[in-house]
Amino acid sequence: MRKSVAVMIGLLVLAVATLAGPGPAAAQKEVVIGLQCDRTGATQTVGVKLCPGYHDYVRLVNSKGGIEGYKIKAIEIDHEYKVPQGMEAYERHKKEGAVLISIYGTPHTQALTQKLTEDRIPGTSPGFGTSAAADGTKYPYIFPIAATYWSQGAVGVKFAKAQLGGSLKGKKIAYLFYDNPAGREPLPILEDLAAQEGFQLKVFAVPPPGIEMGAQALDIAQRYRADFVIAHLFGRSPSVSIKELKRVGFPLRKVVSMVWGASEADVEAAGGGAVAEGYYGMQFAGVGSDYPVLNEIRAMYKKEGKEPPAEMASTVFYNRGVLIAAVHIEAIRNALKAKPGGTITGADVKAGFEKIKGFTLGGLVPPLEITALDHEGGGWVQIFQIRGGKWMKATEWDKAYPEVLAKHIKEAGAKK
């Protein structure tokens, strides 16, 4: 009798457990990432290519069994590049149990910085956001994970110096920028380097929405007579700059754009490769389709009986999506390895980011080394050039003027 009662009790406990759903161990077989995106707002030309790249890399990882036995769940919310919607998206992601937020946009990064720190959830701002966030001691839960605007500005000066024979003394550099906080961000670096290298710096602001800059192009080419142009433009304005500088006869081989003016879409909107021939652009992810990870994604689609997505042809933005997802998942991998079988938190993923070193994804990712002190990972960019109508690699991964950047990061930290 006792035995049968014990069996009945055991079955009852099992039934209750089954009805109650999976326990913590089973539930934790999924790690949630909050993916903010813009597919319908002001920067949709980026989002509609970048976010599919992110999802495809997550699918590739999950198709191989996930990470340390856990599947990755990326929950995308389109915030239309509007800050209120971005804040709402964050709260929804937090309720879903996200241990990491993929931020999209400089104003969103600035709005979320304090919240992420209070909630101990890491957020990433690759190629945008606040440059001072490279300092992990002052911004513990913000990870640029790619070259900030300060680092991009420094590389722009180094590249101009190389292109102009190894010396900038007495040269004229034009800084053509979108007149908003992000556009103005590199100015302190450029001003410091002008004094250090002995070149003249003149700034040319382009008011939003950035679709008219004939006057600036004429001034750069015929009045100021710049020796080199560093451009930092967004949205439709990069293509306008290419067309206008070309129209006034300024050689595009003397122009280098920061990362948001260097996509296939910018070249197409300017009139195609023949118009943009010679134009240089910085990249924080590899460009082109010849990378092992992209071959794996194509193979995944083929196995499913599908054609690779059309977005893959826009290699600049699609590849950036792959890079962001890959760095995120590497941080999660490190967190899971440090806490096998346990429930990982945002703090664990933060620690996972700070252990990333030597992860290059076959060359698509630069040689990042993220630490508790350096959340940027080194400030690496490659420069590509339009040759024969296509983006072709012009430099290897590079960075510049670390002592100048360190000074500004330290000064910004002292004010925080």
Protein language model regions, located:
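Short, low-complexity disordered leader/linker segments with a strong preference
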Residues: 1-32, 406-416
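Beta-alpha junction/loop-to-helix N-cap segments that form part of ligand/metal-binding clefts
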Residues: 30-32, 45-52, 59, 64-136, ...
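Extracellular/periplasmic periplasmic-binding protein-like sensory domains
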Residues: 245-322, 397-404, 409-412
